[in-house]
Regions:
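A residue-level structural signature of the nucleotidyltransferase/glycosyltransferase Rossmann-like core
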Residues: 82, 107, 137-138, 159
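Generic structural signal for small/hydrophobic residues in well-ordered secondary structure
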Residues: 2, 9, 30, 46-48, ...
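Short, strongly hydrophobic transmembrane alpha-helices
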Residues: 4-31
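Mid-to-C-terminal secondary-structure elements
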Residues: 111-127, 139-182
Length: 182
């Protein structure tokens, strides 16, 4: 009967429903599978280690796993479908070999299993395989980086200098979604 109470009740109900919808959308964005994280719901990520000595109370904490730990503890796992190691580096300067074009970009150092865990859509070329173990300097770039450095989408076979080390582009992938964390 009272119009003011009716308006307050309707607005309160609408705000409650809107808040619940926002919470569900945030949860969906954090947990659903979005390209390239197509296996997000089945992925276990280990991002830091804590080691405690047995003989005393000392301990050590690190935010990155060593390559030795990855090779000895994680690569031999048989229960996991795929095990991949990723090192997220700081922003780096990518340049053409002659230095005429330079672009700041985020660089992730990965292994060959990275391409099995994540579902990047290759536009040109293919991912690197086991050749990275032998020390071949290959990399995969996004379409936007290829365009900014070379002015074209297909940069396969071109050379990019990262930190004064030359790498050969073996693949070009589509730019990732803003919802991706990888």
């Amino acid at each position: 009967q009272n119009k003011l109470l009716s308006v307050i009740a309707i607005i309160g109900t609408a705000l409650a429903i809107a808040m619940i919808m926002c919470i569900v959308l945030i949860y969906q964005a954090r947990t659903a599978n979005y390209e390239p994280e197509i296996n997000r719901d089945r992925t276990l990520s280990i991002e830091m280690t804590i080691a405690q000595k047995i003989d005393d109370k000392g301990w050590n904490m690190g935010n990155q796993l060593s390559l030795r730990t990855i090779k000895e503890c994680f690569y031999p796992m048989t229960t996991a479908e795929a095990v991949s190691a990723v090192h997220y580096s700081m922003t780096s300067l990518a340049a053409t070999p002659d230095g005429t074009r330079e672009v700041k970009c985020a660089v992730s150092y990965t292994d060959d299993n990275f391409w099995r865990v994540f579902g990047f859509r290759f536009l040109h070329g293919k991912p690197y395989g086991q050749e990275f173990v032998s020390g071949e300097k290959k990399l995969v770039v996004t379409r936007s980086l290829a365009r900014r450095l070379f002015g074209i989408d297909n940069a396969v076979g071109r050379i990019i200098s990262l930190g004064f080390v030359d790498y050969t582009v073996c693949g070009v992938v589509a730019d990732e979604s803003v919802l991706a964390e990888a």
